Design a protein with these regions (language model features):
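Generic "edge-of-domain/loop-turn" microfeature
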Residues: 30, 89, 101-102
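Juxtadomain coupling helices with adjacent low-complexity linkers
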Residues: 1-18, 47-52, 93, 97-125
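Short hydrophobic/glycine-rich mini-motifs in sensory/regulatory modules
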Residues: 84-94
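A short beta-strand signature within small-molecule sensing/ligand-binding domains used
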Residues: 73-85
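Structured interaction and signal-relay segments at domain junctions
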Residues: 9-74
């Protein structure tokens, strides 16, 4: 996942700007990039068991009003989560999380999250 973290930060910043949501990019264990939220509160922090369950399903997750947290100690809920899959293996996740009152995603936000996960997955194959 080290090769992904080199450009994940730039991708997170662009995605956050486009969606107006905070963005977290994780490997299987930790946050490796963040934008739209204080990085010191997120980087290198462990993923929550709730996020692990979402990622293990290998499917796109969109919040239906639940307030699940992605990172230990982060109180912003997950809006969209899309697993990063490379060569058939789950390698991480791209997340859109709540940001300054924005708590829902529109269809284009969801598509952008899916594209980000596919792009990052292809970069580490």
């Amino acid at each position: 996942m080290g090769e992904m973290s080199s450009f994940a930060s730039d991708y997170a910043a662009a995605l956050s700007e486009a969606t107006q949501l905070a963005v977290i990019i994780c490997d299987r264990d930790h946050c490796i990039a963040a934008a739209g939220a204080p990085k010191r509160d997120l980087l290198e922090k462990s993923v929550t068991p709730e996020l692990e369950k979402i990622v293990e399903n290998r499917k796109l997750y969109t919040s239906k009003g639940e307030s699940l947290c992605a990172i230990e100690g982060c109180d912003r809920g997950i809006v969209v989560a899309c697993p990063i899959i490379s060569a058939g293996d789950i390698t991480g996740c791209v997340l859109l999380i709540e940001n300054e009152g924005v708590t829902t995603a529109i269809d284009s936000d969801i598509k952008l999250c899916e594209v980000a996960a596919k792009f990052l997955g292809s970069r580490i194959e």
